[in-house]
Amino acid sequence: MMNMQNMMKQAQKLQKQMEKKQSELASMTFVGKSAQDLVVATFTGNKKLVSIDFKEAVVDPDDRETLQDMTVQAINDALGQIEDATQKTMGAFAGKLPF
């Protein structure tokens, strides 16, 4: 019975630590960039788009495809950074589970 109580205490402590790390991650800013930094997308750690900036050189009404491609590139770059940070932050807890 004592073991079960200890496991529950450990699980609660771990849950609080995880919540703290998730909160820290959510408050972080991630900046994704396209080739030559022509498009820059900024996200929070919980994957909310904060801003997107287009350099004048990429804004060409006759070439929308390049702008679209670079926008996707910048967004995917930022989301990849968030995923990496999430894995590093939250993956550390996987081996600490008391069961």
Swiss-Prot record:
A GO term, aspect molecular function: DNA binding
SUPFAM superfamilies to which the protein is assigned, alphabetical: YbaB-like (SSF82607)
Keywords: Cytoplasm, DNA-binding
Residue ranges crossing the lipid bilayer per the database entry: none
Highest taxon above the source species: Bacteria
Signal peptide: none
InterPro entries: YbaB-like_sf, YbaB/EbfC
Localization in the cell: Cytoplasm, Nucleoid
GO CC aspect terms: bacterial nucleoid; cytosol
A Pfam family matched in the record: YbaB_DNA_bd
Family membership: Belongs to the YbaB/EbfC family.
Described purpose of this protein according to its UniProt entry: Binds to DNA and alters its conformation. May be involved in regulation of gene expression, nucleoid organization and DNA protection.
Subunit: Homodimer.
Protein name (Swiss-Prot/TrEMBL): Nucleoid-associated protein SMU_394c
Organism, scientific name: Streptococcus mutans serotype c (strain ATCC 700610 / UA159)
